[in-house]
Each structure stands twice: as C-alpha cells, then as structure tokens.
Amino acid sequence: MCILTLVERKHLKNMVHVRLLVMMHILIIYSTFGAVRRPINIRVLEGNSCDTPQVIGGKCMNISLCDPAFVHSIAYQEHTPVCQQNAFYRVICCQPFLDFCENSKQFQIMHGIEAEPGMFPHLARLGLKSEEDGIAWTCSANIISERFLLTAAHCNPVNIAGLGCAESMQCDQQNTVKSFISNPKYKTSFKYHDIALVELEQNIRFNKRVLPICPYISKTDLHESEDLVIAGWGATESHFQSPRLMFATVRTVLQNDCKDHYASLLKASPNKKLHQGITDEMYCAQGALVDNVTEYIDACSGDSGGPLQTKQNNNLYLIGVISTGFGCGSSSPGLYTRVASYFGWIKETVSATRDN
C-alpha cells in the first residue's frame, strides 16, 4: 500500500492542475482553428498560388489583403493553412481583397504609349448613356471586385460602365451603374477626398481581359527611382480623346517635396479647390520631360478615376486614383487620391453592401 506524504499529495494535485490547463488550451486552439490540413510546403512565398479544400486557385497573401467576408468565414477559421508567417507578418492562402487579385503581364495621357490588348484588365470606362446620344465615355475606373469599381468622386454622374475595352467604342462587357458612392468627406467645390466606389447592377464576368486589381495598402511613398504606370483613354497631345488605351511611366514625388512645390505655386496662383495645399491623402507623381518639347509625361482630363499603379510580386497594385493637377504636362506633379488612406472605408462599404 502506497502512502503519500502531505507534500507529495500537494505536488500531485498541482501536476493534475497543470495537465488540465494544458488540455484546456489544446481544446480551445482546436475548437477555434479546427484540424488544419498542412500543405506540402508550409513556407510558400507571398504571391505564389495555393490551394486548400475551401480555396481553389487562391494566392498566398498578407492577411490584410484577403477578402473580409472570407476572413470572417468558417472556411477561413477552420481550414486555412498558413503560407508564411512570423511574429509581425502573416501570409495565408485566401481569396485576396476584394475577391482575388490579378496576376498581370477625364485626365489624358500626355506622350504615352499605346497599350496592348489585355495589358490592364482591371481598367474600366465610365460614361453617360442616353437614347439620343448613345454613350459618352467621361472617366476611367478600376475593377476591385466582381461588383465594385474604384474611381474619382468628381466623375459623377455616370450610369454605365465598360469593361475589357481595348478601343474607344469597343468593350467586351457593359454594365449598368447601380449606385455611385462618393467618400463622405468629398465636396464638389474642392479637390480633396476625390475617391468613390461604383456599384454595378450585375456581377462582372472575369476572364483574361477583365480582372480586378489589388489595392496598395502601405501609406509610405514608394522610392523615387521606382517606375509607376498611369493608363487611360483621355486626350493625347494630338487628339481630344485617344481612340485607344494609352499608358505612360511616372515616378513618385516625395510628399514633402510635393507640398513645398504646391505651396509656392498656390501662393503665386491661389486656387480655392486646393486651399489646404497638399494633404497626406494625396499621392504625387510626375513623368519625365519629353525631348524637344516643354511638356512632361502626365495625365489630363479624360483619364480621371484611372490607376496609378506599381508591379510587385508579379501583381499590379493600385496606389492611387487619377484626380487632378495644375495643367496637362506641366512642371507640377500630378495629384492622385492615395488608396491606402481610404482602405478602411473601401472595405467597410463593400462589406456592408454584401451583407444587405
């Protein structure tokens, strides 16, 4: 017969408590995340394709880029393998925000280059359609989900969207605009918070020529040496409106430099629409000076709402929405609405619409 001392019994009781606590933690973790089927290679690099029982043709993405509806779903909580993570950065296999991202190959593009078909599958056109005059295309927009486009708030009013448009009057798909949702802070008399969501009546039919673009969510300016791309159908140096999609390369003008430039410019030539100067919600970029002319590569009226974009990890990311400037091709940087500053509003608005 084994007789335990008081000390031994107390130690045994403590060990039982420890084991119970460990079992409780295991049960909590299991009930929260479920049995995760580990992929063959758990250290998949960001941007690579991945598959899970719930996600076919997904992509390893920063969790903040995932579709919010998916992140809060049972499928995510129970069966989403981690592609890559550390204490500060988590990458999972999911449908990127919003739905999925493309894997890529009235402002006008001054001194731009004609785009090849399907080069910018996220780019859409916005316009007004009437029985008398047909369609008058007035702005550009960016596909961010199967039902939403992102554009400039000053593009309103519009009632039709063209998708997969290679030439001025030829689009693979046309979709009726259900609602035009300007950012609540936007005022028509000013050039601030110039961003809007366009909700379409029907889901977009995705194909190689029609795909969404990922939002660039960092609020830090990209390096001045990195090439950025603008695109649109606006007027060129030789046409009031380009019959074909054009694109051009520009580079970042750092925020402080841009603020100083416009402060001097607005002091000499006051503009009530820019009475606050350049704000942090704006992104500044400028193209090179064109040889033999006194103009810079730039966007002008007709391209409004189009993209300022960068390519990273084989994906195109939307940095800004073409908004305004101080004359086409001028020496002043072009002004773009910084998408990262409105990322929360975009997510909330799209998610709220889905829930209705």
Curated annotation (Swiss-Prot):
**Cystine bridges:** 50-93, 60-83, 66-94, 139-155, 258-284, 300-328
GO MF term (any one): serine-type endopeptidase activity
* PROSITE patterns reported in the protein's UniProt record: CLIP, TRYPSIN_DOM, TRYPSIN_HIS, TRYPSIN_SER
Consequence of gene disruption: RNAi-mediated knockdown causes a loss in phenoloxidase (PO) activity and a reduction in microbe melanization in response to E.coli infection. RNAi-mediated knockdown in the susceptible strain G3 infected with P.berghei, does not affect the number of oocysts and ookinete melanization; however, severely reduces ookinete melanization caused by CTL4 RNAi-mediated knockdown.
Tell me the name of the encoding gene: CLIPC9
Role summary: Probable serine protease which plays an essential role in the innate immune response against bacteria and protozoa infection by activating the melanization cascade. In the susceptible strain G3, appears to be dispensable for ookinete elimination which occurs by lysis.
Q: Where is the Clip domain?
A: 49-94
The places in or outside the cell where this protein is found are: Secreted
Instruction: Tell me which EC number(s) this protein carries.
Output: 3.4.21.-
Per the record's keyword annotation, is DNA repair included, yes or no? no
* Originating organism: Anopheles gambiae (African malaria mosquito)
According to UniProt, where does the site described as Cleavage lie?
Answer: 108-109
Mostly located where? Answer: secreted
Residues that carry a glycan? 62, 292
In Swiss-Prot or TrEMBL terms, this protein is called CLIP domain-containing serine protease C9
Assigned keywords, A-Z? Disulfide bond, Glycoprotein, Hydrolase, Immunity, Innate immunity, Protease, Secreted, Serine protease, Signal, Zymogen
PTM remark:
Secreted as a full-length protein. Following bacterium E.coli infection, proteolytically cleaved into two chains, p12 and p30, which remain covalently linked.
What is said about its interaction partners and assembly? Answer: In the active form, heterodimer of a p12 subunit and a p30 subunit; disulfide-linked.
